[in-house]
Amino acid sequence: MTSPDRAFDGWLPGVVRRPSPHFNERPEGALVSLAVLHFISLPAGRFGGEDVDALFMGTLDAMNRPEYESLRGLRVSSHFFVRRTGEVRQYVSVLDRAWHAGVSSFEGHTGCNDFSVGIELEGTGETPYEDAQYLACLLYTSPS
């Protein structure tokens, strides 16, 4: 990949911008060369709520929700969240490192967060994705 255009701030036009506090700078010289797709729904199997947004924004009320006990204190984010409607929310500039891949490796390179963009699709991994989600992924991951 080529070096990013410094006039570009890493926030894509046409998406809902929701800056997360859960990110940091990529290592110097790191270039994005990977898109990591995940699925997420909160509560599990329920779509359309605001809990995924709250998780990435650090405002999820895990103390008063027993089903979220395992998420208590978790600091995670993704660059993008694609809702079932096709709406795309962006939490972290693509120039920065979102915290989505955890301990990871790809083709012998460790720390995938350093060189990837994280895309969360609203889903369960068992429920088919919506056409609008596929279209949104194509629009925002295809080279221009």
Residue ranges and their predicted role:
Residues 2-26, 34, 41-139:
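Active-site-adjacent loop/helix surface patches within enzyme catalytic domains
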